[in-house]
Design a protein with these regions (language model features):
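Cysteine-centric segments in proteins
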Residues: 20-158
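N-terminal Sec signal peptide cleavage junction
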Residues: 16-18
């Protein structure tokens, strides 16, 4: 009898509450913080998409139009303009493959940290055949108690 009681208790406590099951068709709602930017223009700037996504994809999770200055990310379901807090990027720009740097951004209670690794770099001085540097990036976003880290890839240039 005690064994049956323990079995029933374990089944009750291992099943999600019915309200959570109904919220998303039987699954617990996602806690994803970083989404796809809704507004993306073509032209010079920095564009990053989730790692592994097709290179022709326009699903960017970070977008910075060189003419607008303030980058965009979709955080918690809405596009947010970020302001740069700090950067360890060399003043003259990245000079070699494998070089690392980071940037920190904020917008209200939203904090973003981006860690860059250069995958390909345009040789200096100006070379019209090389239009962008490519990077692998780790992006960590936090808003209040929520936090998410994603891997991304893309580049900066024209």
């Amino acid at each position: 009898m005690a064994e049956h009681f323990l079995l029933i208790l374990s089944l009750i406590f291992s099943t999600p509450a019915p309200s959570l099951q109904r919220a998303s068709g039987g699954r617990v709602p996602s806690t994803r913080l970083i989404g796809t930017v809704n507004k993306v223009a073509e032209g010079c700037g920095c564009y990053f998409r989730p790692a592994g996504e097709d290179a022709s994809s326009k699903r960017y999770i970070f977008f910075e139009d060189a003419s607008e200055g303030a980058p965009l990310m979709n955080i918690g379901g809405r596009d947010v303009r970020l302001r740069l807090i700090s950067s360890t990027e060399p003043p003259g720009g990245v000079g070699r493959k494998g070089e690392r740097f980071s940037r920190r951004y904020a917008a209200g209670d939203i904090k973003i940290r981006m860690s860059f690794v250069a995958i390909s770099v345009c040789p200096g001085p100006y070379n019209p055949e090389c239009v962008a540097n490519s990077y692998d990036v780790t992006i960590t976003a936090s808003k209040g108690a929520r936090r998410q880290t994603v891997k991304a890839e893309g580049g900066c240039g024209c």
